[in-house]
């Protein structure tokens, strides 16, 4: 009887170990699927955020008789872009993508920091003493006309350095292909058709003063991407992943990274036959 009791206890322990092993195996099998579902949910929330921001922008546009050079645009960009606060202990709201939340405490940063594929940027306005954080980049080609009105003393500089900016809504030939907002690592971007993609897909080769600003958008924040995200991706290979883009006509969609070069970023934009860097 004693031997039988011992055998029973040993068998129960083996059963328990088998159950644990099965649970671990199922967890390993389900983990990628759960991760994909979570990423998809984040992408949907992110796209909804962009639509709300775009709606706010459209309301300002309509109140100003559809004029891109109205001063209200400059006011909107200054006062209502990014999550703004004097402290910002935890940035929330429509400017923060759940796939790229705030990584650093803004008050600990002197001038802010670039974002990454996984985190929001932080921008500091010394004039107002406020931080603005966000996960989305505005197409600055749409805002320069308003900046010229707000700062006429700088108009010649805008005209010389950024002659392709949209001067009026009539310059926008294809509103459904003209980006207003996109996932990015910096508040504003000036993309050009000749821009090369980044090698660092985490930071978008995040050098603040680069003239190659398509890099600020070429981060695989959504869609199918390698894990971990590479920091030395060959520029002659198709880019993985995608970003959410909100367009001037008000709609938004998930755009694969290589397709960013096929959108109408400024008034003189000519989409290349293939993305720069591809053989």
Walk through the language-model features, giving the residues of each.
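N-terminal single-pass transmembrane signal-anchor helix
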Residues: 7-38
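Juxtamembrane interface helices immediately C-terminal to a transmembrane segment
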Residues: 29, 38-49
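N-terminal secretory signal peptides that target proteins for export/translocation
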Residues: 1-6
């Amino acid at each position: 009887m004693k031997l039988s009791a011992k055998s029973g206890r040993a068998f129960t322990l083996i059963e328990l170990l088998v159950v644990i092993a099965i649970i671990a195996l199922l967890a390993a099998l389900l983990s990628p699927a759960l991760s994909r579902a979570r990423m998809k949910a984040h992408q949907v929330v992110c796209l909804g955020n962009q639509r709300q921001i775009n709606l706010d922008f459209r309301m300002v546009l309509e109140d100003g008789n559809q004029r891109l050079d109205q001063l209200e645009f400059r006011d909107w960009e200054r006062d209502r872009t990014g999550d703004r606060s004097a402290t910002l202990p935890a940035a929330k709201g429509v400017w923060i993508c759940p796939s790229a939340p705030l990584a650093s405490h803004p008050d600990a940063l002197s001038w802010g920091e670039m974002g990454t594929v996984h985190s929001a940027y932080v921008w500091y306005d010394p004039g107002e003493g406020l931080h603005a954080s966000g996960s989305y980049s505005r197409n600055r080609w749409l805002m320069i006309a308003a900046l010229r009105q707000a700062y006429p003393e700088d108009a010649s500089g805008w005209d010389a350095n950024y002659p392709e900016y949209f001067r009026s809504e009539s310059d926008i030939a294809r509103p459904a292909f003209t980006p207003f907002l996109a996932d990015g690592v910096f508040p504003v971007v000036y993309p050009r058709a000749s821009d090369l993609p980044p090698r660092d897909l985490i930071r978008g080769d995040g050098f603040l003063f680069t003239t190659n600003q398509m890099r600020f958008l070429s981060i695989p924040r959504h869609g199918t991407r390698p894990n971990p995200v590479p920091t030395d991706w060959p520029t002659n290979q198709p880019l993985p992943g995608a970003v959410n883009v909100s367009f001037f006509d008000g709609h938004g969609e998930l755009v694969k990274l290589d397709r960013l070069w096929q959108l109408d970023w400024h008034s003189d934009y000519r989409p290349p036959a293939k993305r720069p860097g591809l053989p």
